[in-house]
Design a protein with these regions (language model features):
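N-terminal export signals
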Residues: 2-22
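Core of compact, soluble alpha-helical bundle domains
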Residues: 11-12, 25-161
């Protein structure tokens, strides 16, 4: 928690250092100041990676999600070797969805999730884990709503039952 808050504080300080200058330049040009992107407001990739790290670890041990035989099997046999890469992919996906300078290069979401036959209930439980991670790191409700909206937009690609 301290590392992520420290990373967010560093990112926040950097944003404060950058945005006033861009706001002044915007005033001089007659354009409204640029509003920080969701990516910036989440603390950039440091803040996003901290949230991804937490909710990814919680998904592995979540009893609702572990009722799904395919997820449970993956957690028992694949997670140790593949979870670090999955966390990287999730960080890229969220960073891109939040307006960051990254492009998600993983499998299309429907192909990545097909083998798990995820239900709407399981999708909602992953969303709840994301919100719990955002709360853990003190992310404001506005940013939570925006990120959850991006997550929910992927539901038709992820849910198969």
């Amino acid at each position: 928690r301290t590392v992520a808050k420290g990373a967010s504080a560093v990112a926040g300080a950097a944003a404060l250092a950058l945005f006033p200058a861009s706001a002044e330049a915007s005033v001089e040009s007659g354009k409204p100041p640029r509003r920080p992107s969701l990516y910036d407001r989440l603390g950039g990739y440091f803040g996003i990676a901290a949230v991804v790290n937490r909710f990814s670890d919680q998904i592995i041990i979540n009893p609702i999600l572990n009722r799904n035989p395919a997820l449970r099997a993956w957690n028992e046999t694949e997670a140790e070797a593949r979870l670090p890469g999955l966390k990287f992919g999730r960080t890229l996906w969220i960073a891109a969805a939040a307006g960051g300078p990254f492009k998600y290069t993983g499998l299309p979401l429907d192909r990545a999730h097909r083998e798990f036959n995820l239900t709407a209930e399981e999708f909602a439980e992953v969303g709840a884990e994301i919100v719990r991670a955002l709360n853990f790191f003190g992310v404001r409700k506005r940013e939570q709503r925006e990120l959850v909206a991006a997550y929910r937009a992927s539901m038709s690609d992820v849910v198969t039952e």
